[in-house]
Amino acid sequence: MAQSIVEAPIRVDTSRKIIHVDMDAFYASIEEREHPAYKTQPLVIAHDPRQTGGRGVVTTANYVARQFGVHSAMPAAKALELCPTAVFKTPNFPLYREVSAQIHRIFHEYTEMIEPIAFDEAYLDVTTNKKHIHSAVELAHRLQQEIWHQTHLTCSTGISYNKFIAKLASDYRKPAGVTIVLPQDAEPFLLREPIEKFRGVGKKTVPKMHDLGIKTGQDLYAQSELDLIKQFGKLGYILYRRVRGSDDRPVEYLRERKSIGKERTFGPFLQSTTEVNTHLKAIAKLVAASMQSHQRHGKTLVLKLRYGDFVTITKRRTFGEFIPNDAALFEQYAEEIFEEVVDDHFNSGIRLLGITLTGLAPLAFENLTLPLYPNDN
């Protein structure tokens, strides 16, 4: 007689008060503040593709440009195609960093438990706070008011008992919204979310989810833990808990990032050096954008490759100076390392490539390195 598997109940800690603060179109809003005429024009924060030979990626866009379908991480040339009247503004990262620091000083007036995610977003644990404000909603409103008063910028906030739900909530009423998800409301909130909203479910996982009939949180909830782990491994284990409202990750206010990198897996496997170089170029762009967003640079570049037969090679190159955050440079070094390490296992194809920077330090005027090429300005 077959025995049914009884799954243990998931522990859910609802004692915390977590706020996810997400600045609204941060870089574009700063430029609108500095240049009020931009407020009524489609504004794209990126190098103008008409001046770069079509190169470049959109950092962000204002809400006017978004109505044309322009969004972050889009090729700048595609943004121009969608919106020929767009104003392209080269990112001014020193200014954005300065404003971000100003906003973080406001956060510190309320709590020391702050986990920065990027220039424009952070988690705050306000379970106990310096102002002794019992209501997290009241505290979120005060944060919004103080940020507006000091910077003339708006932010949206999500409030809940864990980081996962708070981040989902912050996206609900943009711009300038406040959304709270109470413990008793978490389950219906999560069940109606599209599966794409669950962290870890990316472009490659979505089709597999859809093939299994998983399109919403409710569909995900209906899956057994065993089935999710069989299909998705560690991600399945995590998703089983997330859709049940469980996320015990702390707000890492002492966290210091030790590396920044990106990996891609391939199916079918890569079979030629040309394919490898094409994907290294794309990965290098993502890493450069992430390094710039986190305002870090590093001294060591690491290339990771995994062959079709699962043999994995990791090779690093360390430099005496910080490497400029330049995608072309990351690509060049990664290609050089690849040529050094590639061997007969290449006959089985390549299933994974990754580029990582380590030996990180904050970008600062005293250790900035000038671009190698004049066109990089």
Curated annotation (Swiss-Prot):
EC number: 2.7.7.7
Listed name of the protein: DNA polymerase IV
Catalytic function, reaction form: DNA(n) + a 2'-deoxyribonucleoside 5'-triphosphate = DNA(n+1) + diphosphate
Binding-site residues for Mg(2+), renumbered to this chain: 22, 120
Cofactor binding: number and manner: Binds 2 magnesium ions per subunit.
Cofactor: Mg(2+)
Site entry (Substrate discrimination), positions: 27
Taxonomic superkingdom: Bacteria
Molecular function (Gene Ontology), one example: DNA-directed DNA polymerase activity
Coiled-coil boundaries: none
Top enzyme category: transferase
Subunit and interaction comment: Monomer.
The keyword Metal-binding belongs to this UniProt entry's keyword annotation: yes
Record GO cellular component, one term: cytosol
Family listed: Belongs to the DNA polymerase type-Y family.
Function: Poorly processive, error-prone DNA polymerase involved in untargeted mutagenesis. Copies undamaged DNA at stalled replication forks, which arise in vivo from mismatched or misaligned primer ends. These misaligned primers can be extended by PolIV. Exhibits no 3'-5' exonuclease (proofreading) activity. May be involved in translesional synthesis, in conjunction with the beta clamp from PolIII.
InterPro entries for this protein: DNA/RNA_pol_sf (IPR043502), DNA_pol_Y-fam_lit_finger_sf (IPR036775), DNA_pol_Y-fam_little_finger (IPR017961), DNA_polymerase-Y (IPR050116), DNApol_IV (IPR022880), Rev_trsase/Diguanyl_cyclase (IPR043128), UmuC (IPR001126)
List of catalytic residues: 121
Domain UmuC residues, every copy: 18-202
GO biological process: DNA-templated DNA replication; error-prone translesion synthesis; SOS response
Presence of the UniProt keyword Cytoplasm in the record: yes
